[in-house]
C-alpha cells in the first residue's frame, strides 16, 4: 500500500489541483488519443517512484492528464503486461494509483486477434465479458482500502456505458460489434489448436492484457468500459509458417485510432 500511495502522491503533486474523472488505458498502437487531450500534463512513468516502465511495442510510457470532451481525464499512454516479467501487483499499480487520484470510470482498449470468424481486421469490438487465463491480480492479502476480499464480476463491463456506446456508434455510422475477450499470458501468439479451443469455450477476441486491469478496477468500485480493435485474424488452418507480427498489429491499430478516439470522446462527453 505504501508504494501505491507514494506513486499517487508523486503524480498528484504535478497535477495543479486537477482531479481526473476518467482513467483511460491505451493499448498497442492506440496511444494517439492522448494527443487529443487538451492542456495536457505529461508525466513519464520513469519519473514516478516505484513505477514500472513499458517495454512493449507501441507503448510510449506516459501518464497524460488534461481535458477531453469537457472532462478531466488521465490516460495511460502505454500499459504493462505479464509477459514483460512484471508481477500482477505491478500490473495493478497504475489502476490503484488512478483510483487514489479520484477517477470513477476506467476505459480500457487493446489490440486483439479475432477468434470469432465473423470479425475482420480493423473491426472495433465492445467488450461485454472476459475469460481470464492469467493469474488473478487480487491473489494475496486483500487491500481493504480498495475493496472486498471477494468482488463480484457478474457485470465487469458496465452495461449502461456499453448501451450508450452502441447508440453513439449507430449515430456515427460505426459498425460496432460486441464480444468476449480472452486473456492469456503471451508473449507467443496462439497456436491454431489453442484458437480452436478458445473459440469453443466462448472467446471472440484474443489478447495478452486488459483483464488484470479490469479485475482491479472492479475491486476498486470503478465503472469499466472496454474496446478491442481487431488487428489480426487468428490462424486456425496452420497453413502458414509465420502468421502474426507485432509491428503489423501496431500498424493495424493505428489505422483505426481515429474511430476509437471519436467513440471515447463522445462517451466521455455523456458521463
Range-by-range predicted roles:
Residues 167-204, 264, 271:
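Active-site/ligand-binding-proximal alpha/beta "capping" segment
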Residues 104, 204, 223:
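Short acidic/polar active-site loop segments enriched in Thr and Asp
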Residues 98-102, 199, 218:
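Non-catalytic positions within long, well-ordered alpha-helices that form the structural scaffold/packing
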Residues 235-271:
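His/Asp/Glu-rich mid-to-C-terminal helical/loop segments that flank catalytic regions of hydrolases
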Residues 131, 135-187:
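Histidine/lysine/aspartate-rich catalytic loop segments that bind and position anionic ligands
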Residues 10, 14-17, 160, 164-175, ...:
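Generic non-transmembrane alpha-helical segments
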Residues 1-153:
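Metabolite-binding pocket within alpha/beta catalytic cores that recognizes anionic/polar moieties
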Residues 208-247:
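Zn-dependent metallopeptidase/amidohydrolase metal-coordination segment
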Amino acid at each position: 500500500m505504501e508504494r501505491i500511495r507514494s506513486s499517487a502522491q508523486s503524480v498528484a503533486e504535478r497535477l495543479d489541483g486537477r482531479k481526473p474523472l476518467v482513467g483511460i488505458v491505451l493499448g498497442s498502437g492506440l496511444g494517439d488519443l492522448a494527443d487529443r487531450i487538451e492542456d495536457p500534463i505529461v508525466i513519464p512513468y520513469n519519473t514516478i517512484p516505484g513505477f514500472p516502465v513499458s517495454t512493449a511495442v507501441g507503448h510510449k510510457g506516459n501518464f497524460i492528464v488534461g481535458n477531453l470532451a469537457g472532462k478531466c481525464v488521465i490516460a495511460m499512454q502505454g500499459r504493462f503486461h505479464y509477459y514483460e516479467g512484471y508481477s500482477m501487483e505491478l500490473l495493478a499499480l497504475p489502476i490503484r494509483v488512478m483510483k487514489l487520484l479520484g477517477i470513477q470510470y476506467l476505459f480500457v482498449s487493446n489490440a486483439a486477434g479475432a477468434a470469432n470468424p465473423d470479425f475482420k481486421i480493423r473491426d472495433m469490438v465492445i467488450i461485454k465479458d472476459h475469460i481470464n487465463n492469467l493469474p488473478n491480480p487480487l491473489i494475496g492479502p486483500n487491500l481493504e482500502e480498495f475493496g472486498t476480499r471477494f468482488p463480484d464480476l457478474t457485470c465487469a463491463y458496465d452495461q449502461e456505458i456499453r448501451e450508450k456506446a452502441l447508440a453513439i456508434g449507430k449515430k456515427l455510422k460505426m459498425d460496432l460489434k460486441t464480444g468476449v475477450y480472452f486473456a492469456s499470458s503471451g508473449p507467443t501468439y496462439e497456436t491454431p489448436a489453442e484458437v480452436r479451443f478458445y473459440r469453443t469455450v466462448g472467446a471472440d477476441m484474443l489478447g495478452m492484457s486488459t483483464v488484470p486491469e479490469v479485475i482491479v478496477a472492479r475491486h476498486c468500485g470503478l465503472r469499466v468500459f472496454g474496446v478491442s480493435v481487431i488487428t489480426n485474424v487468428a490462424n486456425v488452418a496452420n497453413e502458414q509458417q509465420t502468421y502474426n507480427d507485432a509491428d503489423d498489429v501496431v500498424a493495424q491499430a493505428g489505422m483505426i485510432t481515429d474511430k476509437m478516439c471519436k467513440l471515447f470522446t463522445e462517451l466521455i462527453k455523456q458521463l
